[in-house]
Every structure is written in structure tokens, then in C-alpha cells.
């Protein structure tokens, strides 16, 4: 089979889940995100009908309401999205055991060797789309290619409900004319650096001297050069999510946050969430990362490694605040905050504690975890969550997992 890799990308996934769950929403402009009553926050997803009005993911709810006054605004419900995603993965595994979830609404599948059972890769894609539509109730675009890179790019070429095949001979014709930002893995900062080298299209990147790219970007330059030619050697890995490298959480704020005091409230809330998930997995971690984005969504990410692994929110918070003070000026507004803990190990041993503080903290965490297990994640919160800067109580904890 020449092009055995498929990428299934659910269209307007969050909004589509709500439409699938509530038939009255079908055909209506559904907008998910923020606080519908107060008209603040950002759009996480928009249905096809809302997108037709100009609504885009990432814009403010207020902007979306102006573009689509008839829009139906809904709060996100991540538990439902996770459930739907799991159902879709189960359908994909009916065709092949080689399924790799890429995000909550995307997954790769390698159908090598499945031809005798299900037909060609295109025939499998048609059957997959039909089953997801009929059994789950959402539409998806499927990209088909010889590798994950081309399958991923193919999936984005025809939305919604598309089916596109990209093979190596298609790269010069269909891929090279595209802006370099369209190449998978190229973000805004990397795009700017490439433009400084007069690289504006993917074709420009493919034709650029490899040695210069390696001098400018190191190993990343080599990978970029390969990607621009449609080359990707990474396999579909069904076990990718089982090897937990880090656990993180991030929140897009409902407004600009100014000054350290406001930002530190959100950082503490995130540390609580992250460390709760770390403990649930039986882990402890050493490397704390803090990610911040400003109002233009230009981002900064910094990390620091501690001397010992921990699952304590207070210890992670202390390091995250140090990173904040060292790398983010107090006058600069913040619109998104993320915290993650990496360098994870199974939490079998505790650091030697001469004064019993670690043991007291461990018992406190265990007690809080038991309360949350029984009564829900937000049955007990830090007092700072009740201040104007707190976001978890109002949002019910709906934020993006890392």
C-alpha cells in the first residue's frame, strides 16, 4: 500500500459534540468558550454555521457575538469531549491496531497490511468517515499520505468533511506554493526567522541550502528541510501517550492580567491542578515549566530543574514564581498562563525530611485528594480562587490539558 497513513481530524470538534448531543443545535451557529452570560473569554470552537459568519477560534467572545448575534454560546464541557474522542479512537482501532492519538480531536492510523480486510487506504478513509458520522455524530476530514507529515497536511486541505490524498509527486505542485507558516511545525516565531532569510513559501524552504539551515537552526534546520520536501520518518506509535513525559495545564484568561499579584493567583491554581494530576498518576517531577502569552499571543516559556522530584503544588509554585519574576516584566500584560511538571518518576521514595514538613504536606495533599475524589475537583479550592483574579471557580476548571 503506497499511502498507508491516515490522519482523522474532527471538524469543529467541541461545537460538533454539542450538536451531536443536542439535536436542536444541528444547523445552528454554536460557539464554545468563555462565559456566555458575561460575554468574556475566547472562542475555543465554532460550528461550521458560526464560521460562516466569520467567527474564528481564538477571537474574543465579544467579537464573536458582534459577528454572529444569533450565535448560541456554550460553556466548554471537556468530559464530554474526552468521551467522544475515546469513542472515535475505538472505531479507528476496528480498522487497525496502529492508532496514535495526536490531540483530543486528531489521530493517526497506519493501515499497512489491512488491504485484504478493508480495501485501499482511500476506501478505508471513506468507511472511517461514514462510521464516525453515523455512530458518533460528528464530521471529520481525513488526510491520506505516505507518512504522518503529508497525511496531516492533507487533512487540512479540505474542510469540513473532506478527504484528501497527498503523495510525494504532489509536494512540488500542492505544498511548495503554500506560505511557510502552513508547514506543520512552523509557528509565528519560526516563521519570522525564516522570513528574515527570505524564505516565504514551503518551496523556498525546500530549495534553501541545507548547510545554511543547519548553521542557523541546528537539528531543527535539518528537520525543516526534510519536511519541506514531504519527508517524515516518524512511525505511527500507539504507545505514545503511555510514556508520560510531562503533565501540564494552561488557561486562556478572560481579560488581560496586569502585575505579578494577579498572575501569581492563576499560577497557584494551575500548580494545584498539575500536581493533583501528577499524584493521581503516581508520579513526582523535577522540571517546572512556566509558559506565558501576552495580548498579541507572543509567548515565552522557561523551565527550571529542582534537586529532587516533587508532587507538591507549593514547591512547584515557588519555582514557577521565580521564573515569572526573572523572565516576565511586571508591566507586561498576560493573556494565557501554563504550568507543567516534567522529569517524571514513579513516586516511591520521599526526600529525607528532618522536620516533618514534607510528611505534613503529603498528608494534607492526600486528604484534599480524597475530598476531590468523592465530591468533585472543585469541592475544595485555595482561598485565592475566590479573589477577582481567580479563574477556576467561575470556569469549573475547564481548561486545556497538556
Curated annotation (Swiss-Prot):
The record's function comment reads: Poorly processive, error-prone DNA polymerase involved in untargeted mutagenesis. Copies undamaged DNA at stalled replication forks, which arise in vivo from mismatched or misaligned primer ends. These misaligned primers can be extended by PolIV. Exhibits no 3'-5' exonuclease (proofreading) activity. May be involved in translesional synthesis, in conjunction with the beta clamp from PolIII.
Return the GO cellular component terms, semicolon-separated.
Answer: cytosol
Gene encoding the protein: dinB
Q: What keywords tag this UniProt record?
A: Cytoplasm, DNA damage, DNA repair, DNA replication, DNA-binding, DNA-directed DNA polymerase, Magnesium, Metal-binding, Mutator protein, Nucleotidyltransferase, Transferase
Site annotation (Substrate discrimination): which residues? 14
State where it is primarily located: cytoplasm
Which HAMAP family does the UniProt entry name for this protein?
Answer: DNApol_IV
- Record-linked Pfam families: IMS, IMS_C, IMS_HHH_1
Provide the residue positions that the database annotates as binding Mg(2+). 9, 105
Q: Which cofactor does it need?
A: Mg(2+)
The chain positions of domain UmuC read 5-187
Q: Where in the cell is it found?
A: Cytoplasm
Root EC class:
transferase
Record protein name field: DNA polymerase IV
Enzyme Commission number = 2.7.7.7
InterPro entries from the UniProt entry: DNA/RNA_pol_sf (IPR043502), DNA_pol_Y-fam_lit_finger_sf (IPR036775), DNA_pol_Y-fam_little_finger (IPR017961), DNA_polymerase-Y (IPR050116), DNApol_IV (IPR022880), IMS_HHH_1 (IPR053848), Rev_trsase/Diguanyl_cyclase (IPR043128), UmuC (IPR001126)
An example Gene Ontology biological process: SOS response
| Catalytic activity, as annotated | DNA(n) + a 2'-deoxyribonucleoside 5'-triphosphate = DNA(n+1) + diphosphate
Task: State the oligomer form and interacting partners.
Answer: Monomer.
Q: According to the record, how does the cofactor bind? A: Binds 2 magnesium ions per subunit.
Q: Name one GO molecular function term.
A: DNA-directed DNA polymerase activity
Indicate the family of this protein. Belongs to the DNA polymerase type-Y family.
Q: Catalytic positions?
A: 106
Amino acid at each position: 500500500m503506497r499511502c498507508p497513513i491516515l490522519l482523522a481530524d474532527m471538524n469543529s470538534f467541541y461545537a460538533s459534540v454539542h450538536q451531536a448531543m443536542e439535536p436542536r443545535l444541528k444547523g445552528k451557529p454554536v460557539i464554545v468558550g468563555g462565559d456566555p452570560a458575561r460575554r468574556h473569554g475566547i472562542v475555543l470552537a465554532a460550528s461550521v454555521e458560526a464560521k460562516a459568519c466569520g467567527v474564528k477560534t481564538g477571537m474574543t467572545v465579544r467579537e464573536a457575538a458582534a459577528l454572529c448575534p444569533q450565535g448560541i454560546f456554550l460553556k466548554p464541557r471537556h468530559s464530554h469531549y474526552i468521551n467522544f474522542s475515546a469513542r472515535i479512537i475505538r472505531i479507528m482501532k476496528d480498522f487497525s491496531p496502529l492508532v496514535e492519538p495526536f490531540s483530543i480531536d486528531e489521530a493517526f492510523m497506519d493501515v499497512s497490511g489491512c488491504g485484504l480486510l478493508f480495501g485501499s487506504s482511500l476506501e478505508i478513509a471513506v468507511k472511517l468517515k461514514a462510521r464516525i458520522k453515523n455512530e458518533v455524530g460528528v464530521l471529520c476530514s481525513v488526510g491520506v499520505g505516505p507518512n504522518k507529515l503529508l497525511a496531516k497536511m492533507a487533512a487540512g486541505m479540505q474542510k469540513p468533511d473532506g478527504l484528501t490524498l497527498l503523495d510525494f509527486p504532489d509536494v512540488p505542485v500542492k505544498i511548495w506554493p503554500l506560505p511557510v507558516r502552513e508547514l506543520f511545525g512552523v509557528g509565528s516565531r519560526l516563521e519570522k526567522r525564516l522570513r528574515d532569510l527570505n524564505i516565504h513559501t514551503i518551496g523556498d524552504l525546500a530549495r534553501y541550502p541545507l548547510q545554511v539551515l543547519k548553521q542557523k537552526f541546528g537539528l531543527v534546520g535539518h528537520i525543516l528541510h526534510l519536511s519541506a520536501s514531504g519527508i517524515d520518518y516518524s512511525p505511527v506509535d500507539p504507545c505514545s501517550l503511555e510514556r508520560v513525559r510531562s503533565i501540564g495545564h494552561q488557561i486562556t484568561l478572560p481579560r488581560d492580567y496586569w502585575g505579578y499579584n494577579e498572575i501569581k493567583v492563576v499560577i497557584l491554581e494551575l500548580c494545584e491542578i498539575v500536581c493533583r494530576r501528577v499524584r493521581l498518576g503516581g508520579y513526582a517531577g523535577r522540571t517546572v515549566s512556566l509558559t506565558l502569552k501576552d495580548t498579541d499571543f507572543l509567548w515565552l516559556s522557561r523551565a527550571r530543574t529542582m534537586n529532587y522530584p516533587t508532587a507538591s503544588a507549593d514547591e512547584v509554585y515557588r519555582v514557577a514564581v521565580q521564573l515569572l519574576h526573572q523572565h516576565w516584566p511586571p508591566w507586561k500584560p498576560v493573556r494565557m498562563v501554563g504550568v507543567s511538571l516534567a522529569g517524571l518518576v514513579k513516586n516511591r521514595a520521599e526526600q529525607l525530611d528532618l522536620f516533618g514538613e514534607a510528611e505534613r504536606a503529603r498528608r494534607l495533599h492526600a486528604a484534599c485528594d480524597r475530598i476531590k475524589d468523592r465530591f468533585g475537583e472543585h469541592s475544595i479550592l485555595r482561598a485565592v480562587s475566590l479573589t477577582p483574579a481567580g479563574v477556576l471557580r467561575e470556569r469549573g476548571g475547564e481548561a486545556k490539558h497538556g
